[in-house]
């Protein structure tokens, strides 16, 4: 009897928090659409980033209060009043950026260009002057300019969600940006014990709850002189830090669908005992 009730609870909670996220994004998008042509660029950027932080903080609060997630994002707080830096996390889940953006009121984010036209995310991203990644030269130029104005740049070096253990190949753009902006790169390690919203996970598929999700800081690299050497060191740092991470269990299989089915079944059986 307990197992069916737990499954029903997990469906209700997962759908409820996704619905809340959609509502937050839609309401904020309407506000951002109105404000974008009215506010001066600098004011609009600050307002946009603060609004995104506040909205996603409400979402993260719902994850905690419903018991869906056990979140530990406190490590990012130490960067809040520091000098400009590139924050470079691994990327196991679709909501990684959303959760990181809750911790700092002035984070620029490099994101996929198609998200800039997304009905849920596009207007807010444009108001916050987030940086699309479809044109590498322009992306690098915009990222360097933003860092020179202060604040933090969130850039996932993999360029997409992690598909293999421990990490995908890294994109050299992070090294180029750090070199030209003359700012350090702070590695952030995301650890999670559930493949919820990983690459290949259907949006409305039930996760096994609660999910443990933790962010910790790794090495901070000085601005690189040689980008190739830096990228080699950066990949080594991620591999060392992610050795034995909880997500290794479900990243080690190349067949995502088979591995996700097996994981869900084993997790459900364990939670029902």
Task: Give, region by region, the residue ranges found by the protein language model.
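A transmembrane-helix-recognition feature enriched in membrane-embedded lipid enzymes
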Residues: 3-72, 123-124
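Short glycine/serine/threonine/alanine-rich loop segments
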Residues: 69, 130, 183
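Glycine-rich helix-loop-beta junction characteristic of Rossmann-like nucleotide cofactor-binding loops
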Residues: 75-80
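Short gly/ser/thr-rich secondary-structure transition/capping motifs
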Residues: 66-74, 133-137, 197-200
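A generic structural signal for well-ordered alpha-helical segments
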Residues: 63-64, 125, 146, 178
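Thr-Gly-centered strand-to-loop micro-motif
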Residues: 74, 111-112, 134, 157, ...
């Amino acid at each position: 009897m307990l197992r069916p009730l737990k499954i029903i609870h997990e469906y209700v909670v997962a759908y409820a928090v996704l619905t809340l996220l959609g509502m937050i994004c839609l309401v904020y998008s309407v506000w951002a659409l109105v404000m974008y042509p009215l506010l001066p660029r600098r004011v609009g950027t600050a307002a946009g980033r603060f609004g995104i932080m506040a909205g996603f903080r409400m979402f993260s609060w719902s994850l905690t209060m419903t018991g869906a997630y056990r979140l530990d994002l406190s490590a990012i707080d130490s960067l809040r009043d520091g000098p400009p830096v590139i924050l470079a996390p691994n990327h196991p889940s679709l909501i990684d950026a959303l959760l990181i953006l809750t911790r700092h009121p002035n984070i620029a984010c490099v994101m996929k260009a198609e998200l800039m036209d997304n009905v849920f995310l596009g207007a807010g991203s444009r108001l916050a002057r987030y940086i699309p990644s479809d044109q590498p030269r322009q992306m690098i130029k915009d990222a360097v300019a933003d860092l020179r104005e202060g604040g933090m740049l969130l850039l996932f070096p993999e360029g997409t969600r992690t598909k293999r253990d421990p990490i995908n190949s890294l994109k050299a753009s992070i090294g180029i940006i750090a070199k030209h902006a003359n700012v350090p790169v702070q590695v952030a390690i995301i650890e999670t014990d559930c493949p919820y919203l990983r690459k290949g996970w259907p949006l409305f598929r039930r996760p096994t709850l609660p999910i443990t999700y933790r962010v910790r800081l790794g090495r901070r690299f000085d601005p690189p002189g040689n980008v190739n050497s830096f990228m080699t060191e950066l990949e080594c740092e991620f591999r060392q830090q992610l050795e034995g991470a909880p997500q290794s269990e479900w990243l080690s299989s190349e067949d995502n669908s088979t591995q996700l089915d097996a994981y869900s079944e084993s997790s459900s059986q364990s939670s029902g005992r």
